[in-house]
Swiss-Prot record:
Self-association and partners: Homodimer.
The gene coding this protein: CBLL2
The record's note on its domains: The HYB domain forms a phosphotyrosine-binding pocket upon dimerization, and mediates as well the recognition of its flanking acidic amino acids.
Organism from which the protein derives: Macaca fascicularis
HYB domain as annotated region, ranges: 93-151
Source lineage: Eukaryota, Metazoa, Chordata, Craniata, Vertebrata
UniProt-recorded name of the protein: E3 ubiquitin-protein ligase CBLL2
Length: 422
């Protein structure tokens, strides 16, 4: 025995140990095969088709026996064995067997997503549909059910919309109501007024003295709406310069109050107040003067159609506050014959007869005349045949002067005078 070589002893499992009972190496000898570093050359092509093992014999399946309708697969011998014995049930799910299909290796795709499913399909598309339908959706449903058990669904509380408090329609509470609500409330409030209230004389048309007239503390739109909600009278208060584009400057209050307090009340559209040193600035073309009527005011683009909707009342100017309180006669639907005609026969200036004409603002008025009536031009405005003399008033025509009862509580109404032929 050569030196350095240890004696070895083999047991029943063909494992050898040293004499000193010290484990040297474990080796399992197979007859006809020798272990070693030997290079093996593989001849052929690699097959990528998966290999499945039968659940009964634990051998790789070469030919599949696919059971219908449960779609479980075994080796063909085991599947036929259970069929021949007479069990007629699937050995995996104990489902009744209708028939057994025979398929070769590589033509069957088995589900391995969930442990224990092992259903087989003949195409990859069918397998993916099965996984999506049976496994992915089931997981989502189970997850949602578990979340509902852990955290049950609580319905959100019903939010109750608080009712808008009913504000008083005075000057102190107008800032709580938007302009849209004023427009909606003005129509029923004016329609519910009796006809007797329209013809009552208005005592609030008098211009206050200069020392008692306060400056307007509220914006223009609030002042306009506050007159809509009044019970007596169909007045509309509008700011003269409510548009920033108008170039006319508002004069100081002391210059105009003595002038207009002493002027008489206009009772006919053919009459024009005597002009003295100062004149009222004409309304800007972009924002014409709104005239009183029992309906909401019209748009800016139609100034000539407004005058046919209100009874005949007076016109008073309050220039310290920047307002015009106007009451339009009811017979402005058709031009009265007292209005002089122009050279071309048009009578458009009769619609503007109740305005104060100011020659100082003629340039500004004619520059923006596109927004007004096209017949109102500079030549027509300066024509002495159209406008009366600046000093003195011509005697009013007896046929067209309205009776005093119409101006102060008469029995004539706006709807009666509107359709009378002239």
């Amino acid at each position: 025995m050569p030196a350095g070589e240890q004696e070895r002893e083999y047991n029943e499992d063909r494992k050898y140990y040293s004499k000193g009972v010290k484990l040297v190496r474990k080796k399992k000898k197979i007859p006809g095969y020798s272990w070693g570093d030997i290079k093996i050359n593989i001849i052929g092509e690699k097959d990528d088709s998966p290999i499945h093992f039968c659940d009964k014999c634990d051998l790789p399946i070469k030919i599949y026996g696919r059971i219908i309708p449960c779609k479980h697969a075994f080796c063909y011998n085991c599947a036929n064995l259970y069929d021949k014995i007479g069990y007629k049930i699937c050995p995996r799910c104990s489902y009744p067997v209708l028939r057994i299909e025979e398929h070769k290796r590589g033509s069957v795709f088995m589900c391995s997503v969930v442990q224990g499913c092992k259903r087989t399909y003949l195409s990859q598309k069918s397998l993916q549909a099965h996984i999506k339908r049976r496994h992915k959706r089931a997981r989502k449903q189970v997850a949602s059910a578990s979340l509902e058990k852990l955290r049950p669904h609580i319905a959100p509380p019903r939010t109750e919309i608080a009712e808008i408090p009913k504000r008083l329609l005075d000057r102190d509470h107008l800032n709580y109501i938007p302009p849209e609500q004023h427009t909606m409330m003005s129509l029923p409030s004016m329609q519910q007024m009796p006809h007797e209230q329209h013809n009552q004389p208005h005592k609030d048309l008098q211009v206050p003295p200069p020392e008692l007239s306060p400056s307007p503390p509220f914006p223009i739109q609030w002042e306009t709406v506050s007159v809509f909600t009044r019970k007596h009278g169909n007045l509309i208060v509008d700011h003269i310069q409510n548009n920033s584009d108008s170039g006319a400057k508002k004069p100081s209050p002391p210059d105009y109050y003595p002038e207009y307090q002493s002027q008489p009340v206009v009772s006919s559209p053919c009459h024009i107040m005597p002009q003295k040193q100062h004149y009222a600035p004409p309304p800007s073309p972009s924002s014409p003067v709104n005239y009183p009527m029992p309906y909401p005011p019209q748009d800016v683009g139609t100034p000539n159609l407004v005058s046919s909707q209100a009874p005949a009342l007076t016109t008073t100017y309050d220039l310290s506050l920047g307002y015009i309180i106007a009451q339009v006669p009811p017979y402005m639907n058709s031009p009265p014959p007292c209005a002089p005609q122009s050279q071309n026969g048009n009578s458009s200036a009769s619609e503007f007869a109740f305005h104060h004409y100011n020659p100082n603002f003629l340039t500004q008025f004619t520059e923006n005349q596109e927004t007004l009536s096209p017949q109102f031009t500079q030549t027509d405005a300066t024509d002495h045949r159209r406008w009366p003399a600046w000093k003195g008033l011509p005697p009013p025509p007896p046929t067209w002067s309205p009776p005093p009862s119409t101006l102060h509580g008469g029995s004539h109404h706006s709807y009666q005078r509107r359709h009378r032929p002239y």
